[in-house]
């Protein structure tokens, strides 16, 4: 008997030990997922508490009984190595699996037993070898994305079992051989991407008619051969990219009325396109037929009125005149290089106001370059023609701010000014320097923005040698101080040469110093304008020596100034005043990284400057201020003393400061939902679309800006890393009214994506209630902040009482209550209870107002 008790006591001890060590019951979905994370290198401290109920973990969604995982999202979690057996392969009810953006190298043998899967995303990993024919087990699969891996061998014929498949992405791998005939069994496909592989052979017979719902097809970058008739029966196609293959025949059979994007470049298509342009081409927005064997004369393009991108370069067209394109009013990109054009470049090109790229190089064009006063033009190539005469001043004046230009191998004349020898050899080879004796020697020196009248006065003065008149004009106009109404401040050559530091500037809350000797020797980097030679001297001029009149805000990271850089670039200049532990090179590397992060809902970082120990970030200016001002009726430019209301940017009119007030676009449910969804998308991109993920750390209403189209843009992302370890806790952890509960504990962890989720929840509450996070009237004396007030109402099923009266009658009250419930989820006390931002985006999309709201 004693032995029996000892045995059962030991068994009980072992059971408790196992439960404590694994934190989940063995052979449960929670156990399998926790083992998966642990063996793939993810620890409990990385936003997961393995002792908590598994259905509360980030990225996990369970069935209604909280017994089985039906969705697992682990994108960008730095998972590495081979997925072990007896982990996720045991999730018998799993419907959706997203393991994208990791370093996974191989799949387990039991992976193919997940026969309930509907969505599988393994993209952007390092999985190699052949793709198993066991994929045929996934009969319910609707989305399969294994792009950007190292798969090789043949695409398995077993794909014919995927009868429910709608989206197939196998691009950017090493798949070989031909496209399997089994693919034709997937008749529900809407999108196919097999691009950037090593596929060869011809398309299976009946390929064009096999997919009646197909809208998107990309076969680019393979060695597939076939004819235009292979695509004749695609009735629903809107996007077609077959570039870089071996297709031939006429392009006639390719075009359908539904087609909007067509890239047929780098193939062997033949024939005359002028006789083939008909109604099937009318929906085209993007057309690339470059590097084929097309012939005839280019004409009839005026029918393609929706076209934005046109590339016909490197074909075998007969010699002909420049085609009429002035009717293509939306054209942004035009490449007619090496198309055997003759005659003149028509001056009507100036009517293409949206044109950004013009390439007519390698032709037989003669005559003068017309005056092209196209505001958006950033690239021009007219090289290797027979052009003569002066390069128009309207073009020369734009060159310092262009991304690419080439006038070489013509008979043009121009004034070389201050162009470097390298630029002269590369872009003006064969042209003649025509500078008159009195020409402006600084024509191409990057200068501060001045008014049009001043530019004209200086140009006239310097080109006529009337020194006395020039001196008078310079005295009258050359030294005006830049003010808020747009007047310009300029410095004489003598004054400019005397600009030397160190420089000290003061605001109400801080004094900052730029310890540099010569302002014009400190470069300013503008990411998308590499030819601009801007210096710290230009920043001084743009901000009137960082004058208080140009101060927009005195925020947490430092003061923000408004200014215009050379080229009319409207910017907000943020001085990062807190000491950084990073070297200049490390800080520059961090800023360069942030400059590469692009998203429609992020304020773009356009450049930076390292001035001594001072780091300066340069942002695109946001015309419509920030959300805090818009919601709480503050005039643009007004700074309040509360820390959570800093970083306000202003908007001016000729009559002074403008106040949008409550009657503007903000007073509708549709607009506020748009702001919420855009901000959520920005955060989801930072958390899940960047590698490594970026934690914002200070999401608040005043960090959400509105561009000229009233689209929301999140600012200040990633700035904390520029300081290294030089920031104190108060700055790292956010602003009063937005602080997550975990940051109020004596010993708390560093910010995580879930702390951003909490802050977003507060912003969502602001949008729905119109109230500030703290120090507002919450209609209940017991509540001292917005979060506790709204959460209390939601718990009592009285969420409608919190809705801002200004928007209550502008849409569905049910949708507005759902938005408050989403905010409730985001502001949960425990980080593990909060959804991810990807999930928040999905929830907000589910309550998107209809078009008539």
UniProtKB/Swiss-Prot annotation:
Localization (cell): Membrane
Residues the entry annotates as binding ATP: 552-560, 574
Side Extracellular, residues: 24-456
InterPro entries attached to this UniProt entry: Kinase-like_dom_sf, Leu-rich_rpt, Leu-rich_rpt_typical-subtyp, LRR_dom_sf, LRR_Rcpt-Like_S/T_Kinase, Prot_kinase_dom
Modified residues (Phosphothreonine): 535, 543
Recorded GO CC terms: membrane
Keyword terms, alphabetized: ATP-binding, Glycoprotein, Kinase, Leucine-rich repeat, Membrane, Nucleotide-binding, Phosphoprotein, Receptor, Repeat, Serine/threonine-protein kinase, Signal, Transferase, Transmembrane, Transmembrane helix
Signal peptide (from-to): 1-23
Entry membrane topology: Single-pass type I membrane protein
Chain positions carrying an annotated carbohydrate: 49, 121, 150, 241, 300, 335, 340, 386, 406, 411, 425
Reactions it catalyzes: L-seryl-[protein] + ATP = O-phospho-L-seryl-[protein] + ADP + H(+); L-threonyl-[protein] + ATP = O-phospho-L-threonyl-[protein] + ADP + H(+)
Spans of repeat LRR: 91-114, 116-138, 139-162, 163-186, 188-210, 212-234, 235-257, 259-280, 281-304, 305-328, 329-352, 354-374, 375-398, 400-421
Disulphide bridges, residue numbers: none
Residues annotated as catalytic: 698 (proton acceptor)
Domain of life of the native organism: Eukaryota
Transmembrane residue ranges: 457-477
Record domain Protein kinase: where: 546-853
Listed EC numbers: 2.7.11.1
Matching Pfam families: LRR_1, LRR_8, Pkinase
Cytoplasmic topological domain: 478-853
MF terms in GO: ATP binding; protein serine kinase activity; protein serine/threonine kinase activity
Chain positions with Phosphotyrosine modification: 619, 738
Record-stated family: Belongs to the protein kinase superfamily. Ser/Thr protein kinase family.
Protein name according to UniProt: Probable LRR receptor-like serine/threonine-protein kinase At2g24230
Organism: Arabidopsis thaliana
